[in-house]
């Protein structure tokens, strides 16, 4: 297979990934592959572009490094072109409502007829099968959080609250990435393709599993947090200092001992309620939990963030200032690791945003291209799989493909 023009880099160089999906979840998987060196083809509808394009800045991050193909993959010669593309594809990711592709005739079996080694990742809100009441429903971030039991655990004691920005989409996209790579590893051993069914609500069910285990195995459900503090453990969560907010985790034997000395509770150490060797203070079960919070609140309120960070570093207590977005760029850790970077858009502008993660030492990722325009690479991709100029123009004339104007 001849690859499309692009630099060779990263741990996934030589891999061809194709995705069909809009907005965030499915495309986030494609973004990860593209930043790690894979050749990633982004399929868009011919009649209307991905709705993410209406956003002024985010698409320049989420669609960088991609090749843009505008093709009607469900109709006539457009479908034939799509299946031809699948013959040279390693991983295909689609994000839709339930078994939407199967309903329109593109089943796993059809895809495997054209490429027996193909890894297929289906990403939907409620999965490829189940009850009709749910399977075909649309789903976005908040829907997946609400249905999974994740949302009800977040917020404050007075009201649940979804986690933003778009947590379920990103977790689901990352799940698609890792699952597809796991499947590809097996395919290269057996020569037999794989189909993966990723339900967003099940992804979030796993993300919310920590507190749920107490309910499933004991009938007790952890209460929601109060003012950003951990619902279980004192000294953990969000706290206010004299000049702003920090988060901290009071965990560890020596950490508790030294902190208690600072906040005036040394006399509680080695008591029946806080015996020697205590590593966590349970805010509900320990009768001194509320007192610990009261004393800690008072001590933190009397000190600046800088003073708290310095003292907690001496005590090996994990803590961090709650940074504002403007503070990120100048933070020395961000600067040292180049966590924020710049790249050129296709129209020559400079765009700034998060850099590639994680950092591969021997085969690093890179940003080699900004977001392509609608249909920008259609002709190049179709030529790559054997279509002539006349073939491409015929697809365009029938409204089955769009090329860049």
Curated annotation (Swiss-Prot):
Determine if Phosphoprotein is one of this entry's keywords: no
Q: Where is the active site?
A: 169
The record's annotation in SUPFAM superfamilies points to: CoA-transferase family III (CaiB/BaiF)
User: Which enzyme class?
Assistant: transferase
Under catalytic activity, the entry for this protein gives: crotonobetainyl-CoA + (R)-carnitine = crotonobetaine + (R)-carnitinyl-CoA; 4-(trimethylamino)butanoyl-CoA + (R)-carnitine = (R)-carnitinyl-CoA + 4-(trimethylamino)butanoate
Q: Which GO terms describe its biological process?
A: carnitine metabolic process
Q: Which InterPro entries match?
A: CoA-transferase_III, CoA-Trfase_CaiB, CoA-Trfase_fam_III, CoA-Trfase_III_dom3_sf, CoA-Trfase_III_dom_1_sf
Q: Which GO terms describe its molecular function?
A: L-carnitine CoA-transferase activity
Q: Has UniProt tagged this entry with the keyword Transferase?
A: yes
Compartments (UniProt record): Cytoplasm
Per the record, its GO cellular-component terms are: cytoplasm
Name the pathway it acts in. Amine and polyamine metabolism; carnitine metabolism
The record's listing under Pfam families reads: CoA_transf_3
Q: Which keywords does UniProt give here?
A: Cytoplasm, Transferase
EC numbers listed for it are 2.8.3.21
**Ligand binding (CoA):** 97, 104
Q: Describe the task this protein carries out.
A: Catalyzes the reversible transfer of the CoA moiety from gamma-butyrobetainyl-CoA to L-carnitine to generate L-carnitinyl-CoA and gamma-butyrobetaine. Is also able to catalyze the reversible transfer of the CoA moiety from gamma-butyrobetainyl-CoA or L-carnitinyl-CoA to crotonobetaine to generate crotonobetainyl-CoA.
Subunit (UniProt): Homodimer.
Protein family membership = Belongs to the CoA-transferase III family. CaiB subfamily.
Annotated protein name in UniProt: L-carnitine CoA-transferase
